[in-house]
């Protein structure tokens, strides 16, 4: 199995409801290690930059408004097949379709406020990690 790193966001809705610890517990219980984490309140410019690939889509303005509505947690997770493992823990993007026991089934209210984001591939994970973290901020977990 390949040890990978992936990028994760706990979105404003889940932060506001004090679900950070419960979500971190899900990550760690699944064998993912948190190698970097910080709380941020995104500016409009930061949110627009992060979600630039969606800038022509109809939901872009609402997405930027939501992601700037309160603090978020950004973290880098490391583990075996981390990208896929993290996405499985998150569940379907629409919480109404998410399997019971997944983060979105348990903590999200709607497809628009769906508690968390996870990278969809190694390439996007590398890009998203670099957007929020310098190499020096990543702390390998050797113990």
Swiss-Prot record:
Report the active site residues: 117 (pros-phosphohistidine intermediate)
Gene that encodes it: ndk
Q: Which SMART domains match?
A: NDK (SM00562)
Q: Which GO terms are recorded in the biological process aspect for this UniProt protein?
A: CTP biosynthetic process; GTP biosynthetic process; UTP biosynthetic process
Q: Which cofactor does it need?
A: Mg(2+)
A cellular component term from Gene Ontology for this protein is: cytoplasm
GO molecular function terms noted in the UniProt entry:
ATP binding; metal ion binding; nucleoside diphosphate kinase activity
Q: Which CDD domains match?
A: NDPk_I
Function, as annotated, reads:
Major role in the synthesis of nucleoside triphosphates other than ATP. The ATP gamma phosphate is transferred to the NDP beta phosphate via a ping-pong mechanism, using a phosphorylated active-site intermediate.
State the reactions this protein catalyses: a 2'-deoxyribonucleoside 5'-diphosphate + ATP = a 2'-deoxyribonucleoside 5'-triphosphate + ADP; a ribonucleoside 5'-diphosphate + ATP = a ribonucleoside 5'-triphosphate + ADP
UniProt-recorded name of the protein: Nucleoside diphosphate kinase
Which species?
Shewanella sp. (strain ANA-3)
The catalytic activity of this protein is classed by the Enzyme Commission as 2.7.4.6
Instruction: Spell out the subunit comment.
Output: Homotetramer.
Q: What Pfam families does its record include? A: NDK (PF00334)
Q: What is its main location?
A: cytoplasm
Q: Which residues bind ATP?
A: 11, 59, 87, 93, 104, 114
**Keyword Phosphoprotein appears in the UniProt entry:** yes
Coiled coil start-end: none
Sorted keywords for this record are: ATP-binding, Cytoplasm, Kinase, Magnesium, Metal-binding, Nucleotide metabolism, Nucleotide-binding, Phosphoprotein, Transferase
Q: Where in the cell is it found?
A: Cytoplasm
């Amino acid at each position: 199995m390949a040890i990978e790193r992936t990028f994760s966001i706990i979105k404003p809705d889940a932060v506001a409801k004090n679900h950070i610890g419960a979500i971190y517990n899900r990550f760690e219980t699944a064998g993912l290690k948190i190698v970097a984490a910080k709380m941020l309140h995104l500016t409009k410019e930061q949110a627009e930059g992060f979600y630039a690939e969606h800038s022509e889509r109809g939901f872009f303005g609402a997405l930027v408004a939501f992601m700037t509505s309160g603090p978020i947690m950004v973290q880098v997770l490391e583990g075996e097949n981390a990208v896929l493992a993290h996405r499985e823990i998150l569940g379907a993007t629409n919480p109404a379709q998410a399997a019971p026991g997944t983060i979105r089934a348990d903590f999200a209210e709607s497809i628009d406020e769906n508690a968390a984001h996870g990278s969809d591939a190694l390439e996007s994970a590398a890009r998203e990690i670099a957007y929020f973290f310098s190499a020096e901020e990543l702390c390998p977990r050797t113990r």
